[in-house]
Amino acid sequence: MRLSNRFEKHVLVAAAVAMGATAAANAAVVYSGILNFSCAIDTDGTYINVETGQLTNGPASLVPGWDVNPYRSSSGSGMNFFSPTGGGMVSAAAGVGSAINLSAGTLIGASSNFSSATATISFGSAAGQWQYASNNIVGFRFVSSAGTTHYGWMRFLMGSQPASGNLVTRTVVDFAYESVAGASIAAGVPAPGAIALLGVAGLAGTRRRR
């Protein structure tokens, strides 16, 4: 057997094992894929229906049944979140109007603390604070069209710190949620890198067919 063939065989086996483990761990996770959607920096902001995958810059009437609404208030730290009844963003304490930046792998579920209807963010170096010019992950809960509570995460790429004011840019990179009602989800899972593994397997298969 040629060395290249043996290498491709090992790649396929490793990819299959890894994909099987990923599928088992995330069988109920619904992932958006990479979106890179630029949010409007105004008081309407962006309305996101995580079940249908629809997101657009306001008004709210454009996205029926929306679940997450990042927007900019006329004053504040740069971005706010508004949640419909039953929703909320993961916060440092229950009912506190803040949305914290989560480390990858943090579990989001019934035992998490959630904000009230409106939540703000703050930038800084302390745990839970958001970072300029970086990806930040926020956790959320929402009530599905079936009336059940689900948990998810959303990744935002925040722009560089503005010279003045609170006009920092914000981009929805991706999001995911648990399709099983009440089930917890790990922040940032599945990661884009895990999905890229499919491309590795596909490449190896293509080379073998030649």
Write out the residue ranges for each language-model feature.
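Short, threonine-centered small-residue motifs that mark membrane-proximal processing/anchoring sites
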Residues: 4-30, 178-206
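A domain-level signal for the mature, folded cores of soluble proteins
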Residues: 28-152, 157-188
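Membrane-interface capping segments at transmembrane-helix boundaries
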Residues: 209-210
